């Protein structure tokens, strides 16, 4: 096999350098890029990935989370709404049995929790450790405490 330099010998030095750099560029899988767009809150790119069917919303990624879980974890309500609009399952569990509502409660996102509940998220779903979403609420998260008032909290 010819060396890299020999392969690009017919090009000018500038073109050769450009082509050699292009060969070295890193390409990430679509799901990695998709999750990065979710974490950054880039709604335009998230929507584009879904519309072009480059990703599945049901996939549990190597992080152990699905796309909706990642959006909740980032605290971006608009991204959560977009994923739900395109069919993300609000009842989907991650590798530890957490639903998006568990994450919203644990991380202190009352607007997201309220939105998920308005769509019918199960307040009584338990994760693999037997915790309800309300069990994970820090008492300092007053809005969440109020939202779940009347349900058992430790």
Curated annotation (Swiss-Prot):
Organism: Homo sapiens
ANK repeat start-end pairs: 63-92, 96-125
Gene designation per UniProt: PPP1R27
Name recorded for this polypeptide: Protein phosphatase 1 regulatory subunit 27
InterPro entries in UniProt: Ankyrin_rpt, Ankyrin_rpt-contain_sf, PP1_regulatory_subunit_27
Keyword Cytoplasm on entry: no
Presence of keyword Repeat: yes
An example molecular function term from Gene Ontology annotations: protein phosphatase inhibitor activity
Role noted for this protein: Inhibits phosphatase activity of protein phosphatase 1 (PP1) complexes.
Subunit structure: Interacts with DYSF and PPP1CA.
Keywords: ANK repeat, Protein phosphatase inhibitor, Repeat
């Amino acid at each position: 096999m010819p060396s890299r330099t020999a392969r690009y010998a017919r090009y000018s030095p500038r073109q050769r350098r450009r082509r050699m750099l292009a060969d070295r560029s890193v390409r990430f899988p679509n799901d990695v890029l998709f999750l990065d767009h979710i974490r950054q809150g880039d709604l335009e790119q998230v929507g584009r990935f879904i519309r072009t069917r480059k990703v599945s919303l049901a996939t549990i990624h190597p992080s152990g989370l699905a796309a909706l879980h990642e959006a909740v974890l980032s605290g971006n309500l608009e991204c959560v709404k977009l994923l739900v609009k395109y069919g993300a399952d609000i009842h989907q569990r991650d590798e530890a049995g957490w639903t998006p509502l568990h994450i919203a409660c644990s991380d202190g996102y009352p607007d997201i929790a309220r939105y998920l509940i308005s769509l019918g998220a199960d307040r009584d779903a338990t994760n693999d450790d037997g915790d309800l979403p309300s069990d994970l609420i820090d008492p300092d998260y007053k809005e969440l405490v109020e939202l779940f008032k009347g349900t058992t909290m430790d």
